[in-house]
Curated annotation (Swiss-Prot):
Cysteines engaged in disulfide bonds, as pairs: none
Family, as annotated: Belongs to the UPF0102 family.
Protein name: UPF0102 protein MXAN_3551
One MF term in the entry's GO annotations: nucleic acid binding
Length: 126
């Protein structure tokens, strides 16, 4: 099996994030940021609805042959997302707001892609 070139993987990842954003917006979420980075890592999507800020990790695979993409969010990745999210809340003066960590899995591409949203997929461990 051929491994995709970095540019091809990035393009594929962008398509997955686009599908996730379309899904969230259809559910009434407002996307605040995409691919926000700090020294702790990257936040794929930051969205809000009402008083809730949602930090979304997006995972994508071309097929489900190797399982659901959401299963690839390791504990170490969760910790990096939590640290980046706390930094985001501080940097954007959102302290005191309710927040949650979701995972969106995208399998396939284009119109045939399936999107699965897992609200509260992990927590901050506080």
């Amino acid at each position: 099996m051929r491994r995709a070139a970095p540019a091809e993987r990035r393009e594929y990842g962008n398509a997955g994030e686009e599908a996730a954003v379309r899904f969230l917006e259809a559910q009434g979420w407002r996307v605040r940021d995409r691919n926000w980075t700090c020294r702790f890592g990257e936040l794929d999507v930051v969205a809000e609805r009402d008083d809730l800020v949602c930090f979304v990790e997006v995972r994508m695979r071309s097929t489900a042959t190797w399982g659901d993409p959401s299963h690839s969010v390791s504990f170490a990745k969760q910790r990096r997302v939590v640290k980046a999210a706390l930094r985001y809340l501080f940097a954007h003066d959102l302290r005191g707001r309710m927040f949650r960590f979701d995972v969106i899995s995208v399998v396939g591409r284009g119109e045939r892609a399936t999107v699965d949203h897992i609200p509260g997929a992990f927590d901050a461990g506080m």
